[in-house]
């Protein structure tokens, strides 16, 4: 039997654009739109809902204005009149994945390349419909990419942007080194104003600087993660850090 996996709503419109009419999208984005209808029914599919429950067979999903309006056994879900009906017998539908540690750049020895064209498309092709970038070498590229996706100019997942790596002296020239708590607060306040959602502390950041960055971010309603080295996990936890990435090294 022919089988395939469909990621919920990706076959209809890219993530974040589902409520927009196709006519409002750029020509490049419209190429990814296979179905342009206000009401769509995906019938006779197998559904994996992401809760840990067993897969449910012969289900029907009704999408209205890009949102899931109903899910259930095909013999109980009423398909609205005028809906575009796709018989997807033999296919499986799962929720789009949320990536919590993602990048839009690629690193080789001595070289880092920003992938504003390919990265968002590859995330969607992998079923990832929302990403959190986790440290940026080009924060403005990512902020502009997020905006272009949200307005329908470019195709890609919904994005939550982490600002530049915040670290201490001796780090990569593409990271922001801070030398005092006041400096850390200033960096956080600046990038918060520019529109980032998270901050990432890196291995060389000191104790006082990390504590100040976390405090300032929390005052502004934002969060901090860290790939730490000088500061230990338990010390960062006591400071109130929101997340931790990778292993520990200096």
Describe the role of every protein-language-model region.
Residues 41, 83-87, 161:
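Conserved beta-strand scaffold positions in the cores of enzyme catalytic domains, especially
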Residues 20-26, 40:
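N-terminal amphipathic/hydrophobic interface segments
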Residues 24-27, 32-34, 47, 52-94:
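Histidine-rich, glycine-flanked metal-binding segment
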Residues 28, 88-105, 115-228, 232-250:
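Divalent-metal coordination cores built from histidine and acidic residues
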Residues 4-18:
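Bacterial N-terminal signal peptides
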């Amino acid at each position: 039997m022919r089988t395939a996996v469909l990621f919920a709503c990706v076959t209809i419109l890219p993530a974040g654009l589902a409520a927009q009419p196709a006519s409002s999208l750029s020509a490049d984005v419209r190429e990814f739109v296979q179905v342009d209808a206000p009401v769509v029914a995906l019938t006779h599919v197998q559904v994996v809902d992401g809760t840990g429950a067993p897969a449910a067979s012969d289900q029907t999903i009704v999408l209205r204005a890009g949102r899931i309006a109903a899910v259930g056994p095909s013999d109980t879900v009423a398909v609205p009149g005028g809906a575009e009906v796709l018989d997807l017998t033999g296919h499986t539908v799962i929720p789009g994945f949320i990536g919590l540690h993602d990048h839009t750049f690629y690193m080789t020895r001595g070289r880092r390349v920003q992938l504003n064209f390919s990265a968002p498309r590859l995330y969607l092709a992998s079923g990832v419909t929302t990403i959190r970038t986790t440290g940026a070498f080009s924060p403005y590229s990512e902020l502009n990419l997020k905006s272009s996706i949200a307005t329908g100019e470019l195709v890609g997942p919904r994005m939550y942007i982490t600002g530049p790596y915040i670290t201490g002296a001796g780090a990569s020239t593409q990271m922001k080194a801070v030398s005092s708590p006041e400096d850390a607060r200033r960096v956080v306040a600046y990038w918060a104003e520019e529109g980032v959602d998270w901050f990432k502390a890196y291995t060389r950041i000191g104790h006082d600087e990390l504590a100040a960055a976390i405090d300032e971010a929390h005052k502004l309603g934002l969060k901090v993660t860290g790939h730490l080295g000088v500061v230990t996990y338990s010390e960062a936890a006591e400071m109130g850090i929101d997340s931790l990435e990778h292993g520990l090294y200096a």
